[in-house]
Amino acid sequence: MLKKTFAALALGTALLSAGQAMAAEYKIDKEGQHAFVDWKISHLGYSFIHGTFKDFDGNFTWDSAKPEASKISVDLKTASLWSNHAERDKHIASADFLDVKKYPEAKFVSTAVKSTGEKTADVTGDLTMHGVTKPVTFKATFNGEGKDPWGGERAGFNATTTLNLNDFGIKGPGATSQTLDLDISVEGVKQK
């Protein structure tokens, strides 16, 4: 009886360890320009301003057999915002909006991943921006994974969400400019 119990325990431990070993750590490849944090906001209800954050870093764990076990963490430098208009960028960076001197970083850390389809998931986590932390859910799409031409392995995702700027203590330039659309595209390099 003891022998059977030990054998079952050993088998269970081996299976559990094998499942944990399948999750891989990836570093987001921003140096190769294979990752982007883009944003869009209404300009007074007449058009949209598009921009990006140029300086960010992050990593994620990914297991295609168990997507719910995945995690992601992204840190970005708020002063790296760019909208192709220097004066507007200065204004957005000012205390009127992002206040990048007081709040130089924004951070997202996932707390849950829920599969919603074969290649889609809701990624929920804590977003800290402008000194406020709120739960946010991104709609994520798995783009694929595999070997790259340089001998490494990669995985890629896109994720979108809409933020209410008032939730983070940020005043938009008008009633129609209170929501910000985020579109994140990441390609990660598997760490050895």
Swiss-Prot record:
Signal peptide: 1-23
Pfam families: YceI (PF04264)
GO cellular component labels: periplasmic space
Keyword GTP-binding attributed: no
Primary subcellular site in the record, as a coarse category: periplasm
Cystine pairs: none
Superkingdom field: Bacteria
Subcellular location: Periplasm
UniProt entry tagged with the keyword Signal: yes
Keywords, in A-Z order: Periplasm, Signal
Entry similarity comment: Belongs to the UPF0312 family. Type 1 subfamily.
PANTHER family: PROTEIN YCEI
Protein name (database record): UPF0312 protein PputGB1_5030
Organism: Pseudomonas putida (strain GB-1)
